């Protein structure tokens, strides 16, 4: 399969690599759509992501695709499901480090609920957040909609972390994709006031008015 590689800071190439082999708790996903993360991906390409200084690495973590194979212990994914958040955390002996590896033709999702039940996924293992966000989406959700939810799930997580409940007021600083998502989700959550204090571009002001 093909994957997007950063061989060294400031460089990007497409490289042929081995297709992942899933274990009993995983599903194999054929990628349909990916999105570029302005923070993580751009910093990995620039060589400025904190704690990552070993290259080459496989790029990407925002994607959507269709399940094409499932492990024997998987219960929460089935053939044909559209899922988000697939990764490749280990490229084995291919000499490639993982920058999450989501910009690959095939990626892997883990059945997080089964892993928890069997004591194989804990916060201490460092896989908790990565596996928890790997989910199937409803069948009517299109690939371009599903991949955007990769950003929305992070915003939703922030709402939960800060205990944002209906009636509370929020000021959003910044009007990029994440800032716009905060405003939109704030309205859906019934927050009392959702203002963006960092709007610079007029088209984003107009876009916000549609919310």
Feature-to-residue mapping (PLM):
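Short beta->alpha connector loops
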Residues: 10-11, 49, 88-90, 152-153, ...
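Mid-domain Rossmann-like dinucleotide-binding core that forms the NAD(H)/NADP(H) cofactor-binding site
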Residues: 139-211
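Short N-terminal strand-loop motif that marks the start
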Residues: 1-59, 122-129
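Cofactor-binding loop segments of dinucleotide-utilizing enzymes, especially the Rossmann-like FAD-
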Residues: 8, 32, 70, 175, ...
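Glycine-rich beta-strand-centered segment in the early N-terminal region that forms part
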Residues: 20-35, 48-92, 99-103, 108, ...
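NAD(P)H dinucleotide-binding glycine-rich loop of Rossmann-like/cofactor-binding domains
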Residues: 90-169
């Amino acid at each position: 399969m093909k994957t997007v590689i950063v061989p060294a800071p400031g460089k990007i190439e497409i490289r042929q690599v081995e297709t992942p082999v899933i274990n009993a708790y995983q599903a194999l996903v054929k990628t349909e759509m990916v999105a570029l993360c302005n923070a993580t991906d751009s910093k990995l390409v620039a060589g400025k992501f904190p704690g990552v200084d070993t290259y080459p690495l496989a790029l990407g973590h925002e994607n959507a695709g269709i399940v094409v194979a499932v492990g024997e212990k998987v219960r929460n994914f089935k053939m044909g499901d559209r899922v988000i958040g697939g990764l490749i955390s280990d490229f084995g002996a291919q000499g490639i480090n993982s920058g999450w590896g989501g910009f690959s033709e095939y990626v892997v999702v883990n059945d997080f609920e089964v892993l928890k039940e069997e004591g194989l996924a804990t916060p201490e293992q460092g896989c908790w957040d990565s596996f928890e966000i790997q989910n199937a989406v409803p069948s009517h959700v299109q690939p371009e909609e599903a991949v955007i939810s990769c950003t929305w799930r992070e915003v939703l997580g922030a709402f939960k972390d800060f205990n944002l409940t209906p009636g509370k007021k929020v000021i959003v600083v910044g009007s990029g994709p994440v800032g716009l998502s905060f405003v939109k989700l704030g309205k859906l959550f019934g927050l009392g006031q959702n203002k963006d204090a960092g709007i610079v571009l007029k088209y984003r002001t107009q876009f916000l008015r549609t919310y």
